[in-house]
C-alpha cells in the first residue's frame, strides 16, 4: 500500500512510500519519489516484546487519527539486518506509525527517553528470540 509521509524521514526527501509486508514479522518501506531511492527493513515490535507507547499529540494530528471512526494504526520499527540474522539490531525508540484509513504515515522521533528507558538503546534481535528459535536459525 502507498502512504503519504506527513514528515520526511531524517536524511531522505521522499514524501511517498510503499509499505510491503513480507510476513507477520517483517515488512519494508520503499521511497517512491525524492532524489534518493531507499528501502528500509521494518519489524513488527509486538512480535518481539511487550511494546507500548503513546503517540505524541502532534503526530496524532498529522496522521489525522480519529478513534470515533475506529482508526487503527500499524506500528513497525527499523531493523538493520546482519548476518547471522540474530545479530540484526532493532530500534524501538523511533517507530513508524501507519494509518491505513487515510494512507498517511510518519516516523515518531520524539519519544522521551525518560518515559521509555526500555527502548533507549538499539538491541540485537537475539535479545528477543527464544533459545529454540536461535538454534533453528543457526542450523
Curated annotation (Swiss-Prot):
Gene3D superfamilies: BH3618-like (2.30.290.10). Keywords: Bacterial flagellum biogenesis, Chaperone, Cytoplasm, Translation regulation. GO terms for cellular component: cytoplasm. It is found in: Cytoplasm. NCBIfam families: PRK13283.1 (NF009791). PANTHER family: FLAGELLAR ASSEMBLY FACTOR FLIW. This is Flagellar assembly factor FliW 2. The gene is fliW2.
